[in-house]
Amino acid sequence: MLQLTPQSRIFLATHPVDFRKGIDGLAAVCRQVVQDNPLEGAVYVFRNRAGTALKLLVYDGQGYGLCLKRLSQGRFTWWPTTANARVPLSARELMILLWNGDPERAQMAQDWRRVA
């Protein structure tokens, strides 16, 4: 289970990654590309090359957790364009991003299909 609080440290990896990578592969990306230690408890957000899915990697002191969000339709509308390997996010910005919104404008995308 992933618990996000306003105090959570969340980092967005700005370059897309191969989503065949699992926990160990994404932890290696944290160390080599993002140049961070994934064992320090931060949440790392990765995007696939197509821009249709996100993976969240977190270490909670007992083990890794990996979450996947794949859109049913379309692509994520917001992604930072920067030379930095990582961008910090707040928990609120991450929730907006997961709902395919734009954290910079705080607008939510329309639901593709209502959940009953």
Regions found by a protein language model. Give the residues of each.
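Polybasic/polar functional segments that serve as interface/processing modules
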Residues: M1-A116
